[in-house]
A protein has these predicted regions:
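Alpha-helix termini
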Residues: 21, 25, 73-76, 80
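Conserved catalytic/binding loops enriched for acidic/polar residues
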Residues: 75-183
Length: 183
């Protein structure tokens, strides 16, 4: 990213797309969703499915350009039995953050009747909260110290009401926290 040092405004962003990403997402989907989606069992995916796979990876990368870090801890807030609940997965997704490496809902079984939308990661509760926290003007504070205290109070209140907003990157903080496994 290229930022304006005076305001922090993002002026320009770059997303690197490696030559093998298409093969990588194909293989991830085949292995992790092959029992749930017959289309995942093919050696060549139709353009619609490949487009969904590209949008999933692109959403994660755009999150980085907006300043979001990996959030490997968010998935630890989802009870495992909820991953097999069609109503839960359709309402909340299988991970609270597209910034996790949760990939696909491979816990779901064919008898759970979870459609493709419930298998794919999507922008979740944590991602929306992180963008709001970082970009939405929320306070009448005129200095960084006051703003900091107001943000801390708001964060504590939000986490109390929604544990899916929990953050743990497993990289710069909580490196020994089992809830923040990377892969």
């Amino acid at each position: 990213n290229v930022h304006d040092p005076r305001s922090g405004e993002i002026i320009e962003s770059h997303i690197c797309w490696y030559h093998n990403v298409m093969t990588l997402v194909h293989d991830w989907y085949m292995i992790q969703a092959g029992t749930l989606d017959e289309a995942a069992q093919k050696m060549k995916y139709d353009p619609e499915l490949m487009g969904q796979l590209i949008r999933f990876v692109s959403s994660h990368e755009v999150g980085h350009t907006l300043g979001l870090r990996h959030n490997f801890g968010s998935s630890s807030t989802v009870p495992v039995d909820s991953l097999r609940s069609r109503s839960f997965v359709m309402a909340h997704g299988h991970t609270p953050s597209i910034m996790d490496y949760a990939r696909f809902n491979y816990v779901a079984q064919p008898e759970d009747n979870i459609p493709r939308e419930g298998i794919f990661p999507r922008i979740g509760d944590y991602d929306c909260w992180a963008i709001e926290w970082g970009y939405k003007p929320m306070f009448n504070a005129y200095d960084d110290v006051s703003d900091h205290f107001e943000l801390e109070a708001l964060t504590s209140a939000r986490l109390k009401d929604n544990r899916r907003l929990w953050f743990g990157d497993g990289e710069t903080n909580r490196t020994n926290d089992a809830r923040c496994q990377t892969e």
